[in-house]
């Protein structure tokens, strides 16, 4: 934190200096390299920042792609500030906020449709509800280090593979849209291993 102080103040704290850490909250995301974890750091200038123990290059590329997708559209896709420091990085803390008007809700869903399109193009397949934060009229995807999908099923032997085969070329594949399943994987596995 000390070595990145000036950049953090400039890029993540809108120029407001800090001298102390008030709080550190861990266990925010999946553990990375040898148990390293994501931390939310609360600073004495009123800002919170997110520490990630890995390169944020993928996140940077994703944000650049969102800029490209937004060109020529009525609205832009929401982004957040990233400070990639090589083997680790810092991010703006994205705080949830409500919409207050019907017009804001409409703009939110327009942008949400843009996100669905962008992630369909990337073949994204592992977004969870925790990855999507509503910031007023702007939906923002966070935690995107695994955003590019490379799991492809061309032949289905298991029920899981059959499901993937059916939805992998669909906007449902990203996980952004609700997908109601009448079959539980756990239930299927229990029957597959049961002896009769």
Language model features: what each stretch is:
Residues 186-193:
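Conserved small/polar residues in nucleotide/adenosyl-binding loops
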Residues 2-122:
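Conserved ATP-binding subdomain of kinase catalytic cores across diverse folds
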Residues 92-183:
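Conserved kinase catalytic-core segment
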